[in-house]
C-alpha cells in the first residue's frame, strides 16, 4: 500500500508542475531573446514550445506573451507577436476561445516604433484570419476599425490600417454588412488632418471595396469616395499616389454597374497623372487607366463616334452633290454652294458670253491663288494637277465643286492637323517615357552606388575599430611589461646595494 501511495501522489501533482515548469521555461526563453548570442536558440525553443502546446496551456502561453513589457528589446517584442502566427498556423480553430486575447496582444504592439514589429502584427492578423475561423470576423475586424478611427498615434494608425487591409484581404467570407458600414467611417479620415497614415488608409479602403465586391453598393458612397480618393493622385507622397490608383482600380474591377457613370471623369484624371516620376506609381496608373478604359458606357467615345459619323455623312453629301443636283441636302451650308453651282454651269451649256468669260477669269485667278496653300497641296495633289493640265472648263467645274464644300475642305484640313498633332504628342510621350526610364535606371545605379559605398564605409569603420582595439591592447601589454621590467630592475639594484 505505501508504494501505491508513493506512485499515485506524483501523478496528481504532475499537471501543476508541468504548468509551472512551462511558465518558467517560456520566461527564461523570452529573457534569452534579449541577448544576441542566444537569440537564435531561444527563438527556436519558443517555436518548439508553441508547436507542442496542449489546449490547457494555450492561455498560459498567451499570457506570457502578453505580459512582455514594451521596454524590452526589439527582437523580444517582434518574436512575441510572431509566436501568435506560429500558434495560429499549428493549432487553428482550437484557439477560437482565446482569439480575443490574441487580438489584444496584437493591439498592444501597434504603437511600436519598430517597423519589423508592425510587420509581424500584420502577419499575425493574416494568420489568425485564415486559420482561426471558429469565431466571427468582427472579433478581429472591430478592434482594428476602432483603433484606426480613434487612435491618434501615427504608428498605431499605420499598423492598424495595414492589419485591417491584410485581414480583410485574407478573409474567405468577410462580413459584408460590417464592411459597408465601416467604409464611410474610415473614408472620412481622408479629410482629417490628425490622421497621418493616408497611404495605408487608402490601401485599406481599396481592400474593403474589393471585399464588398459591388454587392449592395450605393451610388452615394461612390459620389464622395471617388473624388476624395482621386485627390491623392497628386499627393506629394508617392505611396499615397500608388494606393489611390490601386483603390480606383478596385472600383473599376468590382463596381460593374456604377463605375461606368464615373468613367469620363476618372479617365481624365488618370490621363493627366499617367506620367508619374516614380516607376511603381507610373505602372500602377497605367494599369488602372487600362481597367477604366475597358468599362462600357463611355460618353466620350460615343460623342467622338457620333461626330466622326457626322463628318463622314457631310463629306458623302458633298460628294453626291457634285455628281447630282437632285439631292435635297439637310444642311443649309451645303444648299448655297449647290445653287451657285447650277447657276454657273447653265451659261456654259448655252454658250460663253463676255460676262461669263470675266467670271471665269476671276474664278480661275482665285483658284490659282488658293492652289498655293500648303494644306491644299497636301490634301488634293491629284486634283490640283488635273486642273493645271486640263482646260478652262475643267477648272470651272473643279472651282464650283470647291465652292460647294468649303466646310468639307476645312474639316479635312482640321482632321489632318489633329492627326499630325496626335502623332507629335505620341512621339513626345514616347520620348518622355524613354527619358523617365533612363532617369529611373540612373537612380537605381546611384542607389546601388550609395549602398555599396555605405557598406564600404561601415566595413572600413569596423576595421579601424578593430585596429584601435588591438593597438590599445598592445600598448597596454607593453606598459605592463615595461612596468614589470622596471620593478625587477629596481629590486635587483636594491639587492646589490644591500
From Swiss-Prot:
Keywords: Phosphoprotein, Repeat
Biased composition (Low complexity): 300-322
Compositionally biased residues, Basic and acidic residues: 343-366
Region (Disordered): 296-423
Protein name as it appears in the record: TORTIFOLIA1-like protein 5
Gene3D superfamilies: Leucine-rich Repeat Variant
Pfam families from the UniProt entry: TOR1L1_N (PF24714)
Domain of life: Eukaryota
InterPro entries linked: ARM-like, ARM-type_fold, TORTIFOLIA1/SINE1-2
